[in-house]
């Protein structure tokens, strides 16, 4: 919901006569809408069946841990901490930025997504690899909602770098880079195999690729 509006705004400036509607939902709903031709595209980090759908890479996404500052676990981890600004600037992509050992947060309360969500699956795996099962106090359906709930300082949450850059900054958060394959994923645009791609669809995909080019 936070990724598409800027792209749609640019697209509408160029093609004002093309009608665009955005639908937000979980993977099950979105795949169903794509299957019955209710939508032309889906943007998702979940892997859809390649025999039914084609895909085009939108971006690489990294999962961070956002922790309210008041938790004592932060006190000895200053060398790992990232600010909202450093995530905006993508400083964490430098090889000198260390990933925090996740086991330091084994006693924290967590706000996570509901079971079955890709972010939840990855969060569970990261915690398991760190040797603990997270103490979950709240389960929600959207990353943005979990992030806003965590901003009340109830607990830590897993959040993608792409969303951190789109959502408001909260001074009482510190962010931590995470290690492991589960902390990195690809985000794709999906569309049905053998479906005719209109010029509008082609132009929209082209604009998403241009928008996501790295800055010089």
Model regions and ranges:
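Residues at or immediately flanking beta-strands
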Residues: 15-21, 133-137, 186-188
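N-terminal winged-helix
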Residues: 1-15, 19-32, 199
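Secondary-structure junction motif
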Residues: 73-75, 80-130, 197-198
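Hydrophobic hinge/microswitch elements
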Residues: 26, 30, 35, 45, ...
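Short beta-strand-centered segments that line the small-molecule binding cleft or hinge
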Residues: 6-10, 28-84, 174-176
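A late-sequence structural motif
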Residues: 163, 172-216
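Short secondary-structure boundary/capping segments
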Residues: 12, 54-57, 79, 94, ...
């Amino acid at each position: 919901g936070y990724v598409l509006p800027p792209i749609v705004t640019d697209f509408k400036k160029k093609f004002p006569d093309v009608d665009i509607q955005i639908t937000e939902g979980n993977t099950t709903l979105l795949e169903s809408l794509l299957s019955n031709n209710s939508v032309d595209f889906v943007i998702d980090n979940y892997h859809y069946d390649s025999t039914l759908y084609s895909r085009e890479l939108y971006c690489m996404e990294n999962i961070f841990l956002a922790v309210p500052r008041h938790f004592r676990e932060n006190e000895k981890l200053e060398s790992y901490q990232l600010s909202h600004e450093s995530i905006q600037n993508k400083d964490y992509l430098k090889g000198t930025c260390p990933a925090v050992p996740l086991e330091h947060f084994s006693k924290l309360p967590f706000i996570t997504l509901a079971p079955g969500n890709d972010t939840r699956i990855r969060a569970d795996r990261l915690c398991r690899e760190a040797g603990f099962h997270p103490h979950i106090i709240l389960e929600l359906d959207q990353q943005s909602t979990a992030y806003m709930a965590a901003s009340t300082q109830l607990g830590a949450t897993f959040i993608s770098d792409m969303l951190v850059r789109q959502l408001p900054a909260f001074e009482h958060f510190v962010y931590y880079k995470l290690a492991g394959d589960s902390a990195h994923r690809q985000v794709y645009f999906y569309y049905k195999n053998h479906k005719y791609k209109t010029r509008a669809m082609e132009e929209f995909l082209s604009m998403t690729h241009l928008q996501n080019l790295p800055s010089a």
